[in-house]
């Protein structure tokens, strides 16, 4: 390491020889020429966004529904119970707490990097008791301020600050993503449980139908009008109905336990709150919960994972700048202002002193291979971040398009399912009318009833699929994340 030093103490004149001035001037010119390393970050972002498709390759949403702010999307469900459960889950969610801790750690890192790049001032105090040439023993006391500063010649410190701020923004986006996922998970569990109860009602009606058929066949078997094998089959069908009901009831109870774990509420309190929930939304209410009219590049900017990948790319780009800055000389200076007192041998002297220097210009000579290796590693991290950003963009577009395809398919199934439910309902009413006048037996009536119940079960399952698909689209669209307010909303 080579150093150039100049020192002044208790004088206003700074002395340095002409060769030192020349070396300093040449070094500063070299540094100025190398300080303007062009940043590739903006060009990389523009190139990756231009590579996106100019339009969505997926069916549009039905009825071209009105665009709604995603931040207020849960209010469209008009379900205060759901809103309370989401709030409770977000308050207790460990993933949100972990993401929040990452935000605080990133903020602390920003503060540390910013302070490290500024002039440092410390209060110092010294006490020395020792013999001197003139006196056998003396005490020297001093107190004052000591300052030091490493000059940011080509922006390495500034790049470190920008990288730390990018990490902070990335952590903030991660916090928003965690909140969106917890809200979606809670909503899916909530509607999953309520639709499970509706499915349980269908299964319970099916069990009752099978048991009525079994009892009818037992009576006719005893009267000699039904073969024993037919009666045995009816009893087996009734047992199967009881088995399905018990299985469905267990599924519902398990889902309720999951909701208890998510929200932190006691089970009796949660059951009471669920009993006050409004009716489930119908297929008609789900026709236009969201619409996607904007271009892909505009939509995916609202996703926290895309914003996080952008900030990671920026941090990697600034890391390249920092690693390159370490290869060049650094300039530092220091100084102090002191109040001194000497006493000993009957002498008591008080005086003030100050110093400026040394000015140190240092250039690493040995071990530069390690610095070059660190610069190469920073370049590799930047390339990896660029690839990750491109992959995040592609995955974001794919998730939105997959959600749109799912919505289109489910919407097409609504009409067919409604037709099936209506047809089986008409058949059941006709069979009941025939049964009342003796033109149909009980077995025919119960078979028509079971077909109707199966259609009802399919309708409930379709409703659950549609609700889950809407929630998936909400997550795919970013869940109301706004990069301009990524940190202020916390």
Where would I find each of the regions flagged by the language model?
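Periplasmic alpha-helical coiled-coil/stalk elements that build and connect Gram-negative outer-membrane
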Residues: 157, 173-295, 406, 410, ...
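Small/polar-residue-enriched beta-strand and adjacent coil segments characteristic
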Residues: 80-81, 85-88, 100, 107, ...
């Amino acid at each position: 390491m080579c150093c150039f030093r100049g020192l002044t103490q208790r004088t206003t004149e700074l002395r340095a020889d002409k060769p030192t001035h020349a070396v300093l001037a040449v070094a500063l010119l070299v540094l100025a020429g190398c300080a303007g390393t062009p940043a590739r970050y903006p060009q990389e972002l523009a190139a990756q966004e231009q590579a996106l498709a100019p339009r969505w390759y997926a069916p549009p949403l039905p009825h071209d529904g009105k665009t709604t702010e995603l931040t207020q999307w849960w209010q469209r469900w008009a379900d205060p119970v759901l809103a309370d459960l989401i709030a409770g889950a977000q308050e207790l969610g460990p993933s949100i707490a972990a993401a929040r801790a990452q935000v605080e750690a990133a903020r602390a890192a920003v503060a540390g990097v910013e302070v490290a790049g500024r002039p440092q001032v410390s209060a110092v105090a010294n006490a020395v008791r020792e013999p001197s040439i003139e006196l056998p023993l003396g005490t020297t006391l001093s107190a004052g301020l000591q300052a030091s500063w490493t000059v940011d010649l080509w922006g390495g410190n500034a790049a470190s600050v920008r990288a730390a701020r990018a990490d902070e923004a990335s952590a903030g986006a991660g916090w928003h993503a965690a909140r969106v996922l917890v809200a979606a998970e809670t909503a899916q569990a909530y509607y999953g449980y309520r639709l499970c109860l509706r499915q349980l009602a269908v299964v319970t009606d099916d069990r009752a139908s099978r048991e009525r058929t079994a009892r009818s066949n037992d009576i006719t078997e005893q009267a000699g009008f039904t073969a024993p094998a037919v009666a045995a089959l009816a009893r087996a069908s009734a047992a199967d109905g009881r088995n399905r009901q018990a299985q469905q009831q267990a599924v519902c109870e398990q889902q309720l336990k999951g909701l208890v774990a998510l929200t932190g509420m006691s089970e009796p309190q949660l059951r009471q709150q669920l009993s006050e929930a409004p009716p489930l939304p119908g297929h008609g209410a789900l026709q236009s919960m969201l619409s996607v009219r904007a271009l892909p590049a505009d939509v995916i900017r609202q996703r926290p994972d895309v914003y996080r990948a952008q900030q990671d790319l920026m941090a990697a780009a600034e890391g390249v700048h920092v690693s390159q800055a370490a290869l060049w000389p650094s300039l530092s200076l220091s100084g102090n202002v002191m109040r001194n007192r000497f006493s000993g041998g009957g002498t008591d002297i008080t005086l003030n002193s100050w110093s400026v220097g040394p000015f140190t210009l240092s250039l690493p000579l040995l071990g530069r291979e390690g610095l070059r290796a660190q610069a190469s590693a920073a370049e590799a991290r930047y390339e990896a971040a660029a690839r990750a950003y491109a992959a995040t963009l592609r995955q974001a577009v794919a998730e939105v398009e997959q959600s749109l395809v799912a919505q289109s398919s489910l919407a097409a199934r609504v009409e067919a399912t409604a037709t099936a439910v209506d047809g089986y309902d008409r058949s059941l009413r006709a069979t009941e009318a025939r049964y009342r006048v003796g033109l149909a037996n009980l077995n025919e009536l119960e078979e028509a009833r079971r077909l109707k119940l199966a259609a009802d079960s399919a309708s409930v399952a379709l409703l659950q699929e549609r609700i889950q698909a809407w929630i998936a689209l909400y997550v795919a669209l970013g869940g109301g994340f706004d990069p301009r307010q990524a940190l202020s909303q916390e």
